């Protein structure tokens, strides 16, 4: 953290101090999701270009705030979907653009994980306490505040399990697979969307689902996109683009095994 010692990288406790440094041209934001909007807006207004990890924001209003700030300042914003650099996605796009699959009417995207790590149940550091964690700053942008204590420690280290700080399966994992599809097929925004799910395995106080199912309808493309996820099974299913003449099976972006290639059947 803070860079290799020999380069004497300066450390900052708060982002406002860092943004006041005129020697900094761009920033990388890899905080929990609930801080993204404020830091992005502050950064572009301070004249810094921004690379921000997904999910970009927790709420639609936060996304609008970022849009307006970036447009107003003219700074560059890049969203951190790092799998855009996967060569297999470019090859898959070439195959589809050549029409080798024929008309595509159904796409299935999936996430399967089956470990505490994959379900964001991460260890609470033995030295974590009110002196080593600035809890009030951490929870500052969250809609619901709680006092520091055992519950706060759990939320600090496992923040992805609560919508106060993260975006759950939607922004954390589905966003990878949808971005992969968008890169390959340029889907854009669906006309209709519905989702359902629940907390069926990890009864640990979280409020984000551990099972989730999404249907996206693209009537102008004659296509339905399905996404299903579970955090209690490691049956890796991959992602399927099903055409009239052939089906393309892609390695899932957000499964525990990492990014794979693809096959055409």
Kindly give the residue locations of the regions a language model identified:
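N-terminal glycine-/serine-/threonine-rich beta1-alpha1-beta2 phosphate-ribose binding loop
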Residues: 1-52, 61-76
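N-terminal Rossmann-like dinucleotide-binding module
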Residues: 1-6, 83-86, 96, 181
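Short loop/turn motifs at secondary-structure junctions
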Residues: 6-8, 23, 100-103, 189
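Alpha-helical packing segments of well-folded alpha/beta enzyme cores
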Residues: 39, 62-63, 88, 177-180
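The substrate-binding groove and active-site-proximal loops of carbohydrate-active enzymes
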Residues: 49, 80, 167-170
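Short strand-turn motif at the edge of the Rossmann-like AdoMet-binding core
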Residues: 54-56, 80-83, 111
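Rossmann-fold dehydrogenase core element
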Residues: 64-82, 92, 100-107
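Contiguous beta-strand/loop segments that form the cofactor/metal-binding neighborhood of enzyme cores
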Residues: 90-91, 103, 108-112, 117-265
